[in-house]
Amino acid sequence: MPTFDQALRKAGEFGRFQRRVFLLLCLTGVTFAFLFVGVVFLGSQPDYYWCRGPRATALAERCAWSPEEEWNLTTPELHVPAERRGQGHCHRYLLEATNTSSELSCDPLTAFPNRSAPLVSCSGDWRYVETHSTIVSQFDLVCSNAWMLDLTQAILNLGFLAGAFTLGYAADRYGRLIIYLISCFGVGITGVVVAFAPNFSVFVIFRFLQGVFGKGAWMTCFVIVTEIVGSKQRRIVGIVIQMFFTLGIIILPGIAYFTPSWQGIQLAISLPSFLFLLYYWVVPESPRWLITRKQGEKALQILRRVAKCNGKHLSSNYSEITVTDEEVSNPSCLDLVRTPQMRKCTLILMFAWFTSAVVYQGLVMRLGLIGGNLYIDFFISGLVELPGALLILLTIERLGRRLPFAASNIVAGVSCLVTAFLPEGIPWLRTTVATLGRLGITMAFEIVYLVNSELYPTTLRNFGVSLCSGLCDFGGIIAPFLLFRLAAIWLELPLIIFGILASVCGGLVMLLPETKGIALPETVEDVEKLGSSQLHQCGRKKKTQVSTSDV
């Protein structure tokens, strides 16, 4: 009885049918990138902000002040670099403290000795000068409420984490396609609610839910793509779909620049997900998943459809396909750590996901601290990631998965450590080394997706990838706090932490089995055999080397 991989080779491993499905699902990567980094523009700091008191409000109306005049006459001088974004005041002049009973002049400080009015902390009635409206001005996320802006990104990553557990499990139990479609619908609905949220609480709740569904759509589409093509094509589709994520990062600044409000940006992020519901008629359920669920006839129907579109034909020899699993069981967390090889892979992959998220997001946010044009800087940061994908495509088939995976982490780690100790007087060298670190961690982030999906058996693949990548979401939750809290102690301290994490990760991933050119494992036993067979081969090579040297 033929296996699924044999039937897929007969139907075409990457023919016209797979290319069409692949291209359509890759678009999910663009919209997920919008969601993943959209807070940079949704929560962009206003150019200036300050607060009004009762007398300042009356004076502004009577004297017809411009925003700049009100800023200069009612708030204390702010000594910060002119190029720094988000200049603002958390205090105002207490104009009500003057003893005069007459109306203040349009230069209210003349009523105070030495033009020195007392200061008081702001408590509301904020004013903003900004090119585009943002959630900062919408919900007054400044001064004592500034931490709430960090919460908006943390809650999104928490949603990603919840989606990894819940929808990853659901996709393995109920099917890839149905969970993908539900997730896309959820991203659209919750995104619209976020755009028109009447208050911050509603905004946060539905942003969390959008994170849940966003993660479900992204991870499920990635698994569908890797399961519908042959083993030789998995490296290409696994990396190219990451390039579409980078494409989303490159496109987003243009959308944000030409969209005058944060609500418009939020709708641009969310509404395209409704279009993915049309995939119900063109994207099939994963036939590999159907076989593991004892639905071989449905899988054969899809394979015949694939073969017809690819100009192939499945003979009567393929009327049945082998179901590898004697017993089909629902996935469990314990399955990921029950056996030695699965346990080792799971723990290393979790650490790799965590490291990739912390270092990647940390380096991205650190670039934002240097000021400059937000839109251009963000666009350039996206372009830096493209060579990483090309380097992966050139190396992983020649060198395997482990060596590029380890090298990219080590390059990122060493670059962070070197940058931390380079003197400020040679900015070109610091920028060059930092860019090399960004390139390295981008490659590591993209390779971990591919390796994770190749190391887990079919019955656990979606659940396993989702669970391990949950550590990526956990890293995303703590990355902003790790960066800014450590930078307050010493600006370069976060780079040292990032460097240590990435370097350690580079060593650990060398302990993973090599997956170059192998068939996707169908069962846990396949994974155990994969690890033990490679260990045995390694031992035989060492033995041969010893005997040769003795001769």
Swiss-Prot record:
GO terms for biological process: cellular detoxification; dopamine transport; epinephrine transport; epinephrine uptake; establishment of localization in cell; histamine transport; histamine uptake; monoamine transport. It catalyses: (R)-noradrenaline(out) = (R)-noradrenaline(in); (R)-adrenaline(out) = (R)-adrenaline(in); serotonin(out) = serotonin(in); dopamine(out) = dopamine(in). This is Solute carrier family 22 member 3. Optimum pH is 8.5 for TEA uptake. It comes from the Eukaryota. Contains one proline-rich sequence (Pro-Glu-Ser-Pro-Arg) that is required for transport activity. GO terms for cellular component: apical plasma membrane; basolateral plasma membrane; endomembrane system; mitochondrial membrane; neuronal cell body; nuclear outer membrane; plasma membrane; presynapse. Its main location: membrane. Electrogenic voltage-dependent transporter that mediates the transport of a variety of organic cations such as endogenous bioactive amines, cationic drugs and xenobiotics. Cation cellular uptake or release is driven by the electrochemical potential, i.e. membrane potential and concentration gradient. Functions as a Na(+)- and Cl(-)-independent, bidirectional uniporter. InterPro entries: MFS_dom, MFS_sugar_transport-like, MFS_trans_sf, Orgcat_transp/SVOP, Sugar_transporter_CS. It comes from Mus musculus. The keyword Nucleus applies. The lineage of its organism: Eukaryota, Metazoa, Chordata, Craniata, Vertebrata. Highly expressed in placenta. Highly expressed in kidney cortex. In kidney, expressed specifically in the proximal and distal convoluted tubules and within Bowman capsule. Expressed in brain, particularly in dopaminergic neurons of the substantia nigra compacta, non-aminergic neurons of the ventral tegmental area, substantia nigra reticulata, locus coeruleus, hippocampus and cortex. In brain, also detected in astrocytes in the substantia nigra reticulata, several hypothalamic nuclei and nigrostriatal region. Expressed in neurons and glial cells of amygdala.
